[in-house]
Regions:
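Short, conserved loop/turn and helix-capping segments at secondary-structure boundaries
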Residues: 77-81
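A short, conserved beta-to-alpha structural element at the edge of catalytic cores
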Residues: 90-99
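Basic/polar N-terminal segments that are highly enriched at the extreme N-terminus
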Residues: 123-125
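Phosphate-coordinating loops and pocket residues in cytosolic domains that bind phosphorylated ligands
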Residues: 13, 73-76
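C-terminal cap/loop subdomain of S1 sulfatases and analogous C-terminal strand-loop tails that border
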Residues: 1-60, 64, 82, 98, ...
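Intrinsically disordered, low-complexity polar regions and short flexible loop motifs
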Residues: 67
């Protein structure tokens, strides 16, 4: 058991393949610390990966089951329209907790500014 004063959750059920209340998506983000053009956020459930490019609004969708190396971008393919819509909504839900510079009126917002570091990064405090 996880001690009550320890932050986090036990991964035991997850690694044993048992039913577990765990988040549905893994979040990935890239800031502009290396390149001004490389500012995005992505969500994946391990089967599908959705990428939202903050500065351009470009969406990318990859079918990781068929294309684990992400060589075929599927956002414009009619066969993936439902998955694109679902993943876009998941990103809206994910980013909505931040502020209106990320999501406004239920839609993703193209950002003109960037953050080089997380708000919790020691240099920003």
């Amino acid at each position: 058991a996880v001690p009550p004063d320890m932050d986090g959750k036990s991964l035991l059920k997850l690694v044993q393949g048992q039913e577990s209340e765990w988040r549905k998506y893994l979040d990935m983000e890239h800031a502009t610390c290396y390149s001004q053009d490389n500012y995005w956020c992505a969500l994946t459930d391990g089967k599908i990966k959705y990428v939202w490019n903050f500065h351009t609004g470009k969406e990318e969708l990859f079918d990781l089951r068929k294309d684990p190396n992400e060589l075929v971008e599927c956002s414009g393919k009619p066969a993936y329209a439902t998955q694109l819509k679902e993943m876009r909504q998941a990103m809206v839900d994910h980013l909505a907790e931040r502020d209106e510079t990320f999501v406004k009126d239920g839609k993703l917002v193209v950002r003109e500014t960037t953050m080089l570091y997380s708000p919790n990064y020691p240099q920003t405090k």
